[in-house]
A protein has these predicted regions:
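Conserved beta-hairpin
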Residues: 15, 28-45
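Acyl-donor binding region in acyl/amide transferases
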Residues: 5, 47-170
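An active-site-proximal beta-strand-loop segment
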Residues: 20-28, 34, 53-54
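Short amphipathic alpha-helix that is part of the acyltransferase structural core
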Residues: 1-26, 39
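Short, charged low-complexity linker/loop segments at the C-terminal edge of domains
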Residues: 188-198
Length: 207
C-alpha cells in the first residue's frame, strides 16, 4: 500500500462519491491511498477542523494540532487501519510542528471508532450529546444547516426553524445529535503523557 499527497480533484471526487457526508471540507490536505495493485482507493484527509480553538484545551496553537476529518475510501484498500497508520506517520514527517491529532466517531451514523481503536488512539469521551448541531429534519431527511442557509439566503431569509417550516416543510424540526466520540492521537512524548491522563476505557463507549 502506498500513500501520496492528494490533489484537490482527488479530494473532491472521493468526498462526494465515497463518504456518507457527500460534502468537501474546507482547508484540508491529505493523502491518496493506492493498494498493492496500484489502484486508487480514495483519500485520508486532515485539516484545522470547524473549531479554530480546538487546541485550547491542550494549550496548543494552530499548526500544532490538526483534525482527521475524512477517510473517504472505496473499499479497494487491503486494510483501512494500515492506510490510516501510514497517513499518521506521514503527518509527523510533513507537519513537524504538529503535536496532536483529534478525530470524532459520529454516533448518529452508528460509528463507534473501531478504526481509531485499531490504530491505538486514546478515547477521551463523548461531546455534543443531545445537542442541536445546526441541521434540520426536512421532509423526513436530515439536512445540513449550511445547505438550508444557502437555500434561504437566495430569498433574503434567515436560517431559523420558523422560516424552514414556513417555506420548506411545515413539520420540520431541529436535529438533536446523539453526539460524537472523541479520540486523540499524540505525536510527541508530552502529548502522549497528557492523552494517557485523559484516556478512558474503550469498553465504556456506549452507542
Amino acid at each position: 500500500m502506498i500513500l501520496k499527497r492528494a490533489t484537490y480533484k482527488a479530494i473532491k471526487y472521493a468526498c462526494l462519491k465515497f463518504h456518507y457526508a457527500k460534502s468537501v471540507p474546507v482547508n484540508v490536505f491529505g493523502y491518496s491511498v493506492f493498494n498493492e495493485e496500484k489502484e486508487w482507493c480514495g483519500v485520508v484527509l486532515f485539516g484545522t477542523g470547524a473549531n479554530h480553538n480546538m487546541g485550547n484545551p491542550y494549550k496548543l496553537k494552530q499548526g500544532q494540532i490538526v483534525e482527521l476529518v475524512r477517510m473517504a475510501l472505496n473499499g479497494k484498500q487491503e486494510s483501512t487501519s494500515k492506510a490510516l497508520s501510514i497517513a499518521l506517520k506521514l503527518i509527523k514527517k510533513d507537519l513537524p510542528l504538529c503535536q496532536l491529532i483529534v478525530s470524532y466517531a459520529d454516533v448518529d451514523q452508528g460509528h463507534k471508532g473501531i478504526i481509531y481503536q485499531a490504530t491505538n488512539w486514546y478515547y477521551v469521551g463523548t461531546s455534543l450529546k443531545d445537542k442541536k448541531d445546526g441541521s434540520f429534519i426536512v421532509n423526513g431527511k436530515r439536512v445540513h444547516g449550511k445547505t438550508l442557509f444557502d437555500t434561504l439566503k437566495k430569498y433574503g431569509l434567515k436560517r431559523n426553524l420558523e422560516n424552514v417550516q414556513k417555506y420548506l416543510d411545515k413539520n420540520a424540526t431541529e436535529y438533536v445529535t446523539k453526539g460524537k466520540i472523541k479520540y486523540l492521537y499524540p505525536l510527541t512524548k508530552d502529548m502522549r503523557l497528557m492523552c494517557e491522563s485523559l484516556s478512558m476505557d474503550y469498553k465504556d463507549i456506549i452507542i
